[in-house]
Design a protein with these regions (language model features):
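Non-catalytic propeptide/linker segments at domain boundaries
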Residues: 99-167
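Active-site Gly/Thr loop motif
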Residues: 329-333, 380, 384-437
């Protein structure tokens, strides 16, 4: 049986706990640090490790359809200690259970159309959602799945870049080019296809912003106003506007270090309601003054979307009718947490073609497939620098090349903006070139964005 199924499988729970503690002591501080165990990890790590294992392996199994060995290898890239988790797959229930040394066991379950989330007692909201599913369309992209405009020279270039990437261990899984509103080239890594639903991590933030822009266009909210969270009504956080949340200049005290015990890991992997976790965070700076990248803020935007529409079911239905269908998404899943609120910080799984639809919507000024989803004015604001004192090159959950004294990518056009996710996920929009480039993969280090994308632009 494979290694990820049998760690400490036959040891009773109490013995697992004791063995785990003895192992921590026996390894010593230097050895512990070398495999990812710090004093903070001893306190917070088991819950985080069990949560990330259950959640990511569940989605890999039942959303992506990854090979289990590959999914486990991807997981362990985050920390060597994750190689020590025990994992149990329950195909009958479509659930994955994980624990570290038998401690803090967590189970994530799959719901068709909703993907996976860690289960928590007394949080039935997600399981009660009525989910819609549609057959893929054979209409031409971006309305459907048909692609007929492949350019042989551009296709050959992307094939070369994919081969070069993966010969260097960059693990590129999809690379796609849209030019002039058509897919001109697309390539996929081993085991991946044009239908593979790939995790965008923080690129979900950019879709989250579009969803709020849609509500603003339809008159449901004014982004210049506050979000109206009752938890903030009696203190200084009431001064935070929805625009400050979109530009991550809200001033909330939220750490995004991804170490055990920090806010991001606690929110993502140990909290039944991600937005409730962030609603309790205090201010660390005056609203509007400083940019602080925060997945917590993104999940507050998801909460705003849900509250504005009247609850999880109404939010889900609105997303399906006003976003998913008009955009022509074919192979995409937006996961929620146990409370039924979209995980706007992290958990949108979609094919490369679906991710490209998001970029094309922005490039088209808010229109796709004959539907206006956001206003032109919203697009202009979303892609303009914020007014913070420390980092202006960020719009409404979209990264900007311009805004600071120097460009983020000096080799690329100044007007570029992009969605960006962990492991070097990218949807980059090039207005001057009328192009969108999508890159999906699992790269733990740097990716040659400027070099590769400049080569593609030169070939247009």
């Amino acid at each position: 049986m494979s290694h990820y199924l049998v760690h400490l499988r036959d040891v009773p729970m109490i013995k697992k706990f004791v063995l785990g503690l003895l192992l921590l002591v026996a390894l010593g501080l230097v050895g512990l640090n070398s495999i990812g165990i710090t004093p903070a990890f001893i306190v917070y790590g088991p819950g985080v490790a069990s949560g990330i294992g259950a959640k990511l392996l569940c989605s890999a199994e039942y959303v992506i359809g990854s090979e289990r060995d590959q999914a486990f290898e991807d997981l362990v890239q985050y920390s060597p200690i994750l190689s020590q988790i025990s994992v149990r797959y329950d195909d009958a229930e479509r659930a994955v259970t994980s624990s570290l040394f038998g401690m803090k066991e967590k189970t994530a379950s799959f719901i068709p159309g909703l993907g996976c989330a860690v289960d928590y007692a007394n949080y039935p909201q997600r399981s009660r959602l009525i989910v819609q599913q549609d057959e893929a369309s054979s209409a031409p992209w971006p309305a459907g799945s048909a692609v007929s405009g492949i350019d042989p020279e551009l296709q050959a270039l992307l094939e070369t870049l994919l081969e070069q990437d993966n010969s260097r261990g960059l693990n590129t899984r999809a690379l796609l080019l849209v030019h002039g509103g058509e897919i001109k080239a697309e390539v996929y890594g081993q085991g991946m296809t044009s239908e593979s639903k790939l995790l965008g991590w923080s690129m979900a933030k950019s879709l989250n912003a579009i969803m709020l822009g849609n509500l603003e266009m339809r008159g449901f909210l004014n982004l210049s106003d506050g979000p109206g969270f009752r938890q903030w009504s009696a203190d200084a956080r009431s001064a935070i506007t929805s625009t400050a949340l979109l530009t991550m200049t809200d001033g909330l005290d939220f750490s995004e270090d991804y170490n055990p015990g920090d806010d991001a890991t606690a929110m993502l992997f140990t909290s039944p309601s991600s937005s409730d976790y962030v609603l309790a965070r205090p201010l660390a700076a005056d609203p509007g003054a400083r940019f602080n990248y925060s997945s917590g803020t993104a999940n507050l935007l998801s909460r705003l979307y849900t509250d504005t529409l009247g609850g999880p079911q109404a939010a889900y239905d609105n997303y399906r009718q006003q976003i998913f269908k008009p955009m022509g998404f074919q192979h995409a899943v937006f996961e929620t947490d146990a409370s039924g609120v979209f995980m706007g910080s992290s958990y949108f799984y979609a094919s490369a073609r679906d991710w490209a639809r998001m970029g094309q919507l922005m490039l088209n000024g808010g229109v796709l497939n004959g539907h206006r989803l956001v206003s032109e004015a919203w697009i202009a604001r979303a892609t303009s620098p914020n007014q913070s004192e420390n980092d202006k090159a960020y719009g409404y959950q979209w990264w900007l090349n311009r805004g600071n004294e120097s460009l983020r990518f000096p080799e690329l056009p100044e007007d570029v903006y992009y969605a960006n996710g962990n492991r070097q996920q990218l949807v980059m929009v090039f207005p001057s070139q009328q192009a969108v480039i999508v890159r999906l993969g699992w790269t733990s280090g740097r990716y040659p964005v400027a070099d590769n994308f400049a080569r593609i632009l030169e070939a247009l």
